[in-house]
């Protein structure tokens, strides 16, 4: 396809060139009606990216409306670069999650790196200083050589960008499953801190005000990146490498500092990152939100390559670029700030009263489009939904409790499953301590970052067990939100809100859309029950390859507030003689569990049941006990069940052990993944106070200084292992798999 506006408009329709841009026949006819004429090549390209799923949410928008987005502390919900929640003292936390799945499948290093860069820009475009990054990653089995390559390069890309840009990577999650073999998921989250008075919006307001371009020149990288992200991943995906952007973290570091200084000037009206769809999306969205129009001259846009067409400049996704609206006559004030940081900024257009998006190039109008048709008036589709064929069969299955002969060996095998195994190989590559505010580093239930100059801190996590959501999307959606909140509470913080990263297959498949629909309903119910509004998010669809879809993976990024750093609670056992309790009861629930997969190689049956009222009550009571100072450690019981939680609580290098005695069926008690459960340790002087909070909690045993994990069932020892040996297996699993030959 020629990347030029020289192609005659009639030829675009005759040869159906718009199909290659991602537009349907019906959508092209709608564009003709909007314009009252044939669109030219540049206009067709502009519509194609703005009407892509990635930019318009045209199939997911009806579902997103189901999320609760309001709350007493929400200052900015969905609709801007990131959401904003009040944390008191005229301060707020800003956060969002974003996906970079397709680019990471094609060019994993740059795909992951630019995913980090893009989400950081979303946060500082709101006026916030980025203080932490997290990620949520999915790959195929680590026995596959291509998976090893993708895994290694994605982690290297996240580390390469994050470490250089000066924002600590403090947490995240990594899971492995066959459904992600050809379609990895790379979701990046950023958290920022802001004063209320500094909150910005991406608007182009004030007739006659100037549109300013800031950052490096525009090149040909990333053209049609938004469209690429809105289609199935092709088998010959190497041809899509030009759609992957190239990032420069050192440029971004300068851009952060320059923009945060610019934001202090009252000459600034609005600011937005040039993300997906580049100049096209930032300019048209800023005008649409302000109810204005915008005129831009592409001859003024800095260009990295010679002979770039209007089409290429408008659709380029070159990185580290920002678009600003500045008061007319005060442009030089802003230009001078950027120059101080060695960055170029130039006027490229102005705000106009007529609500059109008018683009000029080489003394010719190359696009003249009603601005709202690109944003709020983009098409929205109510997709057909059909219950997945497998779901009813799974619901009717009676999953037997696996018969275990050797409990110690089963524990060892589970500790070496890649999804459970230690992720030190990953997070050791990340700089988690830059900015010197990280209190709880990667590897705990939630990361914790202190707020300088205050007693407060922020807890943050990313969570999603996609196997549960595959088995039962509605129940799995509830569990995803509940587990994220559970992890925040275990750290001693109160959950504030969440950002959602909805990763699904092709929404034109009614069964996939049903997965989306039910997942959102489940998540929404949990958000209501746990008082955690959705303040931002991202949708990534068409995550399938060779006709095979990923498991539905709606990732939850959640942030919580510590009113005092004294309430920060570790996930590891602390001292010998501390009493160990389990809050919540285990049931024979093995559908989607790690034990089920270990013994059968499958995930099938019912997902674990969750009662949201019980979940909310237990979280509230545990948080109250933590604030009273009676909890020594708290750990969420999740993948692998109680046995894994016990082992993980000992893996802190202090030489501690535990003596545990449980009553009931050993397999159920140790390996069930029943929900709403916590493993806590309590100093024995606080045991009575704890039991008054949780009279139903099971007293399991005590912490020892013997370096042994001893588990008995009705006083009969079934596991007696050195903690050091268990920890070595847990830590060595992923490095061992990466070194092995497939």
UniProtKB/Swiss-Prot annotation:
Task: Give the Gene Ontology MF terms in alphabetical order.
Answer: ATP binding; magnesium ion binding; phosphoribosylformylglycinamidine synthase activity
Which SUPFAM superfamilies does the record associate with it?
Answer: PurM C-terminal domain-like (SSF56042), PurM N-terminal domain-like (SSF55326)
Q: Which reaction does it catalyse?
A: N(2)-formyl-N(1)-(5-phospho-beta-D-ribosyl)glycinamide + L-glutamine + ATP + H2O = 2-formamido-N(1)-(5-O-phospho-beta-D-ribosyl)acetamidine + L-glutamate + ADP + phosphate + H(+)
Any one Gene Ontology BP term: 'de novo' IMP biosynthetic process
Q: Which Pfam families match?
A: AIRS (PF00586), AIRS_C (PF02769), FGAR-AT_linker (PF18072)
This protein's record includes keyword ATP-binding: yes
Question: Which sites bind Mg(2+) 1?
Answer: 98, 538
The record's Gene Ontology cellular component field reads: cytoplasm
Task: Give the pathway annotation.
Answer: Purine metabolism; IMP biosynthesis via de novo pathway; 5-amino-1-(5-phospho-D-ribosyl)imidazole from N(2)-formyl-N(1)-(5-phospho-D-ribosyl)glycinamide: step 1/2
* Residues noted as binding substrate in the record, renumbered to the chain: 99-102, 121, 245, 317-319, 540
Which Gene3D superfamilies does the UniProt record give?
A: PurM-like C-terminal domain (3.90.650.10), PurM-like, N-terminal domain (3.30.1330.10)
Q: What is its EC number?
A: 6.3.5.3
Which domain of life does the UniProt lineage start with? Answer: Bacteria
Q: Which keywords appear in this protein's UniProt record, sorted alphabetically? A: ATP-binding, Cytoplasm, Ligase, Magnesium, Metal-binding, Nucleotide-binding, Purine biosynthesis
Provide the active-site residues from the annotation.
54, 100
Q: Which positions does UniProt annotate for Mg(2+) 2 binding?
A: 122, 273
Function of the molecule? Part of the phosphoribosylformylglycinamidine synthase complex involved in the purines biosynthetic pathway. Catalyzes the ATP-dependent conversion of formylglycinamide ribonucleotide (FGAR) and glutamine to yield formylglycinamidine ribonucleotide (FGAM) and glutamate. The FGAM synthase complex is composed of three subunits. PurQ produces an ammonia molecule by converting glutamine to glutamate. PurL transfers the ammonia molecule to FGAR to form FGAM in an ATP-dependent manner.
Q: HAMAP family, alphabetically?
A: PurL_2
Record protein name field: Phosphoribosylformylglycinamidine synthase subunit PurL
Quick one: which gene encodes this? purL
């Amino acid at each position: 396809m020629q990347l030029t506006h020289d192609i005659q408009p009639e030829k675009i329709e005759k040869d159906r060139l718009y199909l290659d841009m991602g537009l349907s026949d019906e959508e092209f006819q709608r564009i003709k009606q909007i314009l009252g004429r044939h669109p030219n090549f540049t206009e067709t390209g502009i519509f194609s990216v703005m009407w892509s799923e990635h930019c318009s949410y045209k199939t997911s928008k009806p579902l997103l409306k189901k999320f609760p987005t309001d709350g007493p502390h929400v200052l900015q919900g969905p609709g801007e670069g990131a959401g904003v929640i009040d944390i008191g003292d005229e301060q707020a936390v800003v956060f969002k999650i974003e996906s970079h799945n397709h680019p990471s499948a094609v060019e994993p290093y740059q795909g992951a790196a630019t995913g980090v860069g893009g989400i950081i820009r979303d946060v500082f475009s709101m006026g916030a200083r980025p203080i932490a990054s997290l990620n949520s990653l999915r790959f195929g089995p680590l026995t596959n050589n291509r998976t090893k390559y993708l895994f290694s390069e994605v982690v290297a890309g996240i580390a390469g960008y994050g470490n250089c840009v000066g924002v600590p990577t403090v947490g995240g999650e990594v899971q492995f499953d066959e459904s992600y073999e050809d379609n990895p998921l790379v979701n990046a989250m950023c958290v920022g801190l802001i004063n209320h008075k500094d909150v910005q919006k991406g608007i182009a307001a004030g007739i006659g005000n100037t549109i300013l371009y800031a950052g490096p020149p525009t090149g040909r990288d990333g053209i049609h990146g938004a469209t690429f992200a809105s289609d199935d991943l092709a088998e010959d995906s190497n041809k899509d490498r030009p759609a992957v952007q190239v990032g420069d973290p050192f440029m971004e570091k300068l851009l952060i500092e320059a923009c945060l200084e610019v934001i202090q000037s009252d000459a600034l009206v609005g600011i937005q990152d040039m993300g997906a769809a580049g100049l096209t999306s930032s300019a048209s969205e800023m005008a649409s939100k302000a109810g204005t129009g915008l005129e831009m001259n592409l001859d003024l846009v800095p260009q990295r390559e010679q002979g770039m067409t209007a089409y290429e400049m408008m659709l380029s996704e070159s990185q580290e670029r920002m678009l600003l609206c500045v008061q007319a006559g005060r442009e030089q004030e802003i230009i001078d700030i950027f120059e101080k940081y060695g960055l170029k900024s130039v006027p490229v257009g102005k705000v106009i009263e007529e609500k059109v998006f008018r683009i000029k190039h080489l003394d010719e109008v190359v696009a003249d489009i009603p601005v709202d048709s690109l944003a709020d008036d983009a098409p929205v589709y109510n997709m057909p939904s059909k219950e997945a064929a497998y779901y009813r069969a799974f619901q009717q299955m009676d999953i037997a409790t696996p018969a275990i002969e050797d409990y110690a060996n089963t524990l060892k095998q589970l500790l070496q499953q890649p999804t459970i195994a230690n992720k030190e190989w990953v997070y050791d590559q990340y700089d988690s301590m830059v900015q010197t505010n990280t209190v709880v580093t990667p590897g705990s239930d939630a990361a914790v970052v202190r707020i300088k100059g205050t007693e407060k801190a922020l807890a943050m996590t990313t969570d999603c067990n996609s196997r549960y959501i595959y088995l039962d999307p509605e129940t799995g959606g509830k569990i995803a939100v509940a587990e994220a909140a559970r992890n925040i509470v275990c750290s001693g913080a109160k959950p504030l809100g969440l950002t959602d990263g909805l990763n699904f297959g092709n929404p034109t498949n009614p069964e996939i859309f049903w997965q989306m629909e039910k997942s959102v309903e489940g998540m929404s119910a949990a958000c209501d029950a746990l008082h955690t509004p959705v303040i931002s998010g991202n949708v990534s669809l068409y995550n399938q390859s060779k006709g095979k879809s990923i498991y539905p993976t709606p990732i939850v990024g959640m942030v919580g507030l510590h009113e005092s750093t004294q309430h920060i609670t570790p996930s590891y056992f602390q001292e010998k003689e501390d009493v160990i309790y389990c809050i919540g009861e285990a049931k024979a629930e093995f559908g989607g569990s790690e034990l089920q997969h270990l013994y059968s190689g499958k995930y099938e049956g019912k997902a674990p049941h969750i009662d949201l009222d019980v979940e909310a009550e237990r979280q509230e009571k545990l948080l109250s006990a933590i604030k009273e100072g009676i909890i020594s450690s708290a750990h969420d019981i999740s993948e692998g069940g109680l046995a894994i939680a016990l082992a993980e609580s000992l893996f802190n290098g202090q030489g501690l052990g535990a003596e545990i005695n449980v009553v009931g069926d050993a397999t159920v008690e140790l390996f069930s993944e029943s929900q709403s459960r916590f493993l806590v340790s309590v100093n024995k002087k606080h045991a009575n106070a704890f039991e008054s909070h949780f009279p139903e909690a099971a007293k399991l045993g005590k912490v020892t200084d013997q370096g042994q994990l001893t588990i008995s069932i009705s006083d009969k020892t079934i596991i007696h292992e050195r903690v050091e040996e268990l920890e070595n297996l847990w830590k060595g699993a992923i490095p061992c798999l990466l070194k092995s030959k497939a």
